């Protein structure tokens, strides 16, 4: 019987905020453990929330082999890789930062009210097995979400100040958000024209859609927008999209649910606009004769699968540096909050934009009224593509 052990520990210290004041401080420290056993092409799994002895879970997992769940695939093996990206963050440090930030916001922006949280997260993921696999990922970071409300409006909320960082720099956070809130006070109209440049802080919506379309099983069965198009030029030659497991970029483990570690923590799925890989786990690769790309998902107590959400594991590679130069003097929109939209199966996209700003490539100038935008994946990443820039 081959054995595999997964342990996840998550510690969170949260300063809860209401009406621009710290109202409570809460600490959570949760351990989750899972054990997988493999015998005669079958898998048995046991899991628990809590720090239970491995031997207890091991016995339960062996019993669960009787369920007959097939898993005739080789285990990841002969690799030790331990990485740590951040040390412990004291609870008092979280409270001190929250109080300091709120003092400035109350003083300089009394026309806004702020709520939600300032938190510190410490995480540890480990996976080891009887075949010589020994992986461990440790990290710690500040996570801030301050929902803002203009006191003069009847809205439940009007936007948010957000930040995620291993090393929180208070003055940098305040400097950016002073400009953000000053622009929020300055109400401006939409520039003229049906077609305008739009920038976002991330690319969650298109990457979630692309992640679903790159599912190897869906691709092989003909149910993907990309089915049969491997090797074709689908997007701008400037675009490279990677399956990226670099914790410095993603803040998540560098291995998938089957313990697969990618070379240099990344693998291109689109390279210079060409579709060069789809997403597969061990089962999908073997079943459909596709390259194995290390994209298994699943919880600590689940059978690894390809059927998870892959958008968060994908990333555009930076291909441009100067936003102002790219705009060539044209006014642009910085879409800060756009929820309620989606892609259709053919790649068409539409969404309302709740919070957006007029942007000149260097400065946020003023807050725009709510509007709706629409496009198509082929245009967004083809003729209308401007670039992917580092967040600075």
Which stretches of residues belong to each language-model region?
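Active-site bordering "gate/hinge" segments
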Residues: 1-255, 263, 271-274, 363
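Dual-mode signal for accessory low-complexity, basic/Gly-rich regions
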Residues: 230-392
């Amino acid at each position: 019987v081959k054995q595999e052990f997964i342990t996840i520990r998550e510690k969170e210290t949260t300063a809860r905020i209401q009406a621009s004041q710290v109202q409570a401080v809460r600490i959570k420290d949760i351990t989750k453990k899972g054990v997988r056993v493999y015998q005669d092409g079958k898998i048995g799994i046991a899991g628990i929330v809590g720090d239970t002895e491995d031997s207890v879970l091991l016995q339960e997992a062996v019993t669960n082999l009787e369920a007959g769940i097939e898993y005739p695939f080789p285990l990841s093996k002969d690799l030790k890789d331990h990485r740590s990206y951040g040390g412990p963050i004291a609870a008092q440090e979280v409270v001190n930062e929250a109080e300091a930030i709120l003092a400035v916001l109350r003083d300089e922006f009394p026309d806004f009210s702020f709520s939600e949280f300032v938190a510190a997260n410490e995480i540890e993921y480990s996976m080891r097995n009887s075949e010589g696999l020994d992986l461990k990922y440790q990290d710690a970071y500040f996570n801030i979400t301050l929902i803002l409300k203009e006191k003069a409006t009847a809205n439940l909320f009007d936007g948010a100040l957000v930040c995620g960082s291993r090393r929180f720099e208070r003055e940098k956070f305040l400097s950016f958000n002073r400009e953000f809130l000053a622009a929020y006070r300055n109400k401006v109209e939409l520039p003229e024209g049906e077609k305008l440049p739009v920038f976002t802080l991330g690319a969650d919506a298109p990457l979630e859609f692309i992640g679903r379309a790159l599912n190897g099983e869906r691709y092989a069965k003909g149910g993907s927008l990309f089915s049969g198009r491997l090797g074709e030029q689908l997007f701008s030659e400037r675009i490279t999209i990677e399956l990226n497991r670099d914790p410095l970029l993603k803040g998540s483990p560098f291995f998938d649910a089957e313990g697969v570690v990618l070379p240099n923590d990344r693998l291109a799925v689109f390279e210079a606009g060409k579709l060069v890989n789809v997403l597969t786990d061990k089962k999908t690769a073997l079943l459909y004769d596709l390259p194995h790309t290390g994209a298994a998902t699943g919880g600590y107590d689940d059978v690894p699968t390809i059927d998870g959400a892959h958008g968060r594991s994908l990333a555009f590679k930076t291909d441009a540096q100067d936003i102002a130069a790219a705009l060539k003097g044209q006014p642009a929109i910085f879409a800060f909050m756009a929820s309620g939209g989606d892609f259709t199966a053919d790649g068409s996209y539409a969404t309302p934009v709740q919070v957006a700003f007029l942007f000149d490539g260097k400065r946020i100038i003023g807050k725009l009224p709510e509007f709706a935008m629409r496009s198509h994946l082929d245009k967004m990443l083809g003729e209308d593509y401007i670039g992917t820039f580092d967040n600075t």
